[in-house]
Amino acid sequence: MLACTPKVGITGKPKVETSTFEFDYAFGPESTNPDIYTLTTEPLVERCLNGQCGVIFAYGQTGSGKTHTMNGIMDELCESNIFSEGTEVDFTYLEMLGVDIKDCLAADPNPSPKPVAIGEGLDGRILTRNVSVHPCADSSALKALVSKAKSLRSTAATEKNAASSRAHGIGIISCKDVETGIAGKLYVIDLAGSESAKDSKKHDSKRMAETKQINLSLSNLKECIRARTMASEPGKGGIHVPYRRNKLTLLIKDVFEIGCPRICSTVVITNVSPLASDVAHSCNTLKYSGPLRVAVGKGRVNLEKDEEDPANWTVEEAEARITEAWGSEVGNVKAFVGGLSGVQVR
């Protein structure tokens, strides 16, 4: 991708300075929402249906079209093939700013509902509290939930955007195989826009505090992705990924954890403004996004499926393993397992 920056030379004559950035694909003004969905999200959906984890998010300055892009992707997701036979689909939508987390689909109409909490269990699993999970029987049910979540997003007028998203919007789609009990997850994240000092110069104290929280969480997200990208390269061991510093990166821990047994995939969509007045911020966005790309052939080969890990056992395997190890002590193994797979028993 080529970015052209208008400048004035030392002689006073105008000139154009060019910068080149490498990405896997660049979408132009002729690209449609279905085009973007097909190239960026459709492969993640297939992986999610196979019990894997996928994350897609849009990053860029406020007013560059992130929410429009992610709304288009969510609309296409509602019409996708996730509602296949033998698959249970659940949907959750959270809004996050710093340590403050809101469940946009909470049933409690109280203006001060119970606070949402995200933490890490002793076994490494991510645990949530006061988060509602909504079963979706078909695309119409998912559409209704997505529409409700959109209407409850926190927005405010800023210098660049009359309806700027002031928090990260996180849609979580879970697709569980009824037979095995293994659920794949897809996180669709509409990040709040990054803002420069120029963008926020007219903010009041509340907006300034929001901007500080937004930029801090975006900085940590970029640091985690860069570290994880480096760790994917052969010979790059001992790299620390600081996903525990922020609730957003903790929530999608599987994407960043080195050695995670679940196959995870991440897609970063970089949104830039076409305005000449925004070229400095656009170049800065491209500069930070470019290194997040993993070159083809350099990714770390995924770990082989560990047959000894209970998370990989089907219902039948869980019953057989428990019978072999503790059959006489457990008694009725089928009642003990309760039709749960290894990942559920675990």
Please identify what each model-predicted range represents.
Residues 65-67, 99-105, 196-199, 235, ...:
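Switch/connector loops and helix/strand junctions flanking conserved nucleotide-binding motifs
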Residues 1-38:
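Charged, amphipathic alpha-helical linker segments immediately N-terminal to NTP-binding catalytic cores
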Residues 185-203:
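Switch II (G3) loop of P-loop NTPases
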Residues 336-346:
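A short amphipathic alpha-helix within small helical-bundle interaction modules
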Residues 38-49:
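Pre-Walker A adenine-sensing motif
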